Amino acid sequence: TDENFYGHSKKSYERVRNLFKGMVDRGIYQNWFGFTSLNIYEDDETLDYMAKSGCVGVLIGIESINEDALKSMNKGVNLRITIDKYKEAIKNIRKHGLAVWGTMVFGNDNDTPDTFKDVVDFILDAKIDIMTCGILCPFINTPLQKRLDGDNRLFRTNFPEDWIYYTSHHLTYVLSKLTLQEFIDGIEYVYNNIYSTEVIRKKFRAAKDEMNNLNAAMFAFRVNLDWQEVYKHLLENLRELQASGDYERALERYEALKR
């Protein structure tokens, strides 16, 4: 994540541990939430102080359960921990009564129609309390944008008007191993199995029992309801793109230039 309070050095770990220990020692209790990375899961002492200081959860950039996709995103911390240990890491964080808010990105070149079910299975098996999923966004002048542009796959390039599409809620490039319909079907599968009201309520009931922290469970419940609407909007954007014909025209152009 961008605002990683835990960091990646021994000095950083000690600073964070001392901060939350200081809050606990002084009787300071404040509901709070922070952004960090998976490597925090091994630091039980810090996690304990975080919970006692009022932390309700942490956001962690999981991004993908595909190793090649993680390499393409330079997610070094996740690769060092290895995907096999993701569930163990999440379980240990939740053991301290902290909700885990994961983020996932769809639209990588390695994504296939099977990716969406694999991700849903992982989210449910790992008991991730909140999962926010978005579409890979090729921000201007990034290596990703330059690569997609060089391959003639970008189709939202009429700037400044097209800046509105450069969020994680819009598709701006031709997909690699998916048709647009497969992508929409996959996103809809995620919505039905992660963001439905029934699933959100079920996760809330489980979180109350498993984390033994009502504040954390309520926090996750509220965020999930918010993201239910956000993800619905993402789906609407994809359907509007399909109806406009812009994607099919971009695909035809891409295929013609490949010949």
Label the model's feature ranges.
Residues 1-6:
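Active-site groove signature of glycoside hydrolases
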Residues 204-259:
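Membrane-proximal basic amphipathic "stem/tether" segments
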